[in-house]
Amino acid sequence: MAMAMAMPSSSPPLFFSLLNLMLLLLLLAPYCSAVSVPNNNTHHRSSSPTQTTLQQLHSPDSPPPPPLPTPTVTTPTPPPPPPAPRPPRRHHRIPPPPPPLLPTPPPPPASISPTPAPPLPPPPAPAPPPTPTPKFPSSSANPSPPDAYPFTNYPFFPNFAAPPPPTQQQQQQPSGDGGLPTFPANISTLVHPTQRPPRRFPVLQALLLSFLSLCLLLLSALLSLHLFRRLRHRHHSHSHPNARSPSSRSGATNHHHDDDGDGDEEGRRLKPPPMPTSSSNPSTEFLYLGTLAAPPQQPPPTTSHLRPGSPELRPLPPLPRVGPPSGEFASRSSASDPSTAPPAAAEASSSSLSPSSPSASSPTLGSSPVHLRPPSIPQPRGRAPNPSPPKRRPQPPEPMAAHAWNPFVPMPPQAPPSEEEEEHSPSEKSMRKSRPLHSDKLKPGSLHMKDEMIHLYLNNSMAAAMPREVCLLGAPRCHGIGMLVGALGISKEQVREAILEGNAHGLGVEALRMLMQMVLTNEEELKLKYFKDDLSTKLCPVEAFLKAVLDIPFAFKRMDAMLYVANFYLEVNQLRMSYATLEAACQELKNSRLFHKVLEAVLNFGNLMSIDTGSPNSHAMEPNTLLKIVDVKGADGKAALLQFVVHEIVKPEGHSPVCKTNANTTQQYDVEYRKHGLQVVSKLAAELSNTKKASSIDMMKLSRDVSELGVGLGKIHDVLRLNSMVTSADSARRFHNTMSMFLRQAEEEILKLQAQESICLSCVKEVTEYFHGELSSGDEGHMARVFGSVREFLAMLDRICKEAGEEMKSSGWMMGRDWNMAAPMGMTTP
């Protein structure tokens, strides 16, 4: 029995080797049988000439046969000496009856030549009847009749003398005469066998056996792999007892860990040992779970419901003591030598007897020897065992005496712990690392809950008492105002403080504009003002912000006044800069010598061309007329009037004092004069820069802005009048002081701005009358058109100067006196 139980742990390698060897032999057997099986037709054909030759050699009456057609044999070898005479052997075999011979004409003698037979063609579908071979003459004149059983009456080796070897002449003589050597008469009835198709059964059998052998080999390999993994898993589970479930660890204390521990465990699982016949004589070689604890003795329960072969009644073998005393019981043979036990058993025994172990704490298991632990259920593969916290190892008891193995004898008291064991505190023993729990994989902040949520779920009365938010203005309105409040980034306390003090610069222009977008209607203001918070309802955060603002008297009127204050100085500065630009443009047009010279030259050429150059009272040509003669071309169709004017002005402007000192001849420095004059003319656009800026200013808009600033001062006076009626003197006084100071400064700035406006208008009017003459009452709004015309003329002059500079580099100058001007717009020249 022990050998059979130990076989699964030790025999698998040998068993697998034998199984693989047998399968390999089965795999090679078909090939060996296919090689060893001969062909019946070939053997029959090859054996007939051999037997015939041997009979010819040992026959005394027959001559030797002709030589075989083999090219390698040239001369016949002498025959071996004859053997000793032996009695003839007769075969007592009853041969089958010969087939009936049909009388057919003999074939011609030419077919009996010694030449080798040609290869046989494949047999036709209908097999022809067998043709008997011709009867050749024997050594005597009269041939003897053929015998029905030629191979039975004559021995295989007759006792006759060997004939002499045939000569070359005899071999060359043709056969057919009576004296020539021929085949013996006893084989004259041989019939050449007909060719049959080869049989394919051995090849198919070999392939079939090979396929079956390969399937068996694969099946055995899979079985070997399965058994190997199973044994490895079992060995791993025994070597790591901490990975088991608590029930498996508690049951591991009753297993016998020795060399054949795996085999014993498998044997006990397959077949439990028989039950003891009586409990009066308990065996001392088995360990019962009742000895692990000493509960109060109770009457044994009935065991009529338990079968003898039940696993609950299976006794457990003694367990060895491992390492230091660990509180487990072992056999007497292994208790004296604790070093013989493997360390794996020590870990299993130390982790099994824990305070939470069910086998050690159940009082019903130790009441009777028949109550035994059921077999441990193995954990299913692929599922991790249930984790458990680290167990505390109990203090080991003293070694038990021989009589203590009786389950009915009480255990002696345990000895006090030693000093070495006291050094290891329970906290240090419990520091052993255990398997991580599923809760350890959670993030630290995932279990965090707010205090409000805890109160909401734990105290329902508190949650019921919380006020409910209401929205008086409606969800869309509150959403829009909430976006503005969020964009402000200012608390309602800061807004209230700035409005009460009138600090416009503290909030800023953007914040005041956003607050002005929250202006409410009278109905909405009344709803928010007369709403009172209670325990059941409260306003939403947006409406609470608006209510805090509306608590200030005339809040939105104050914000409007503060927005005017924040924008006042910015608008005043812009108006001052615009008026200053207009005044500078007027001064540039009056004081620019080069501009007047260009205008005078254009006026002279215009008069020569009979072009209306403006009103008769004007001192210069209108800017609009300058734009008309820009595209007038000369006789060659290339040079324009403005180009000729520029060329004529460039030469006198180029005679600077620096150039005159170095001018010895006019022809040498003529190009330099023109180049210098071109630079002077091209600077005209830079001298009239304010004129270009003034062309984009709308004087009518400037007048409206000054008027609006004066109207804004009236709003400030209205807010101060309303603020004086507020009962709260402190808040009203602060706002009144701030606004009163601003009013005094704003009135002074507006007066200065109005004076500057009048001066600017007079200058613009004077420049306009210089070009256009006296203006009527309806043309006062179009006085700034002169700046736009001058800007366009300067742009064309700048373009012509650039073209002249490029021509100077590429070719010579075209003189004005060589030009023939064409009359533009259908007019003729004088």
Swiss-Prot record:
Its main location: membrane. It is a single-pass membrane protein. Keywords: Membrane, Signal, Transmembrane, Transmembrane helix. GO terms for biological process: actin cytoskeleton organization; actin nucleation. Residues 40-195, 235-446 are annotated as: Disordered. It is found in: Membrane. Residues 40-59 have a biased composition (Polar residues). SUPFAM superfamilies: Formin homology 2 domain (FH2 domain). Residues 61-86, 95-135, 314-323 have a biased composition (Pro residues). The chain crosses the membrane at residues 203-223. Belongs to the formin-like family. Class-I subfamily. This is Formin-like protein 14. It comes from Oryza sativa subsp. japonica.
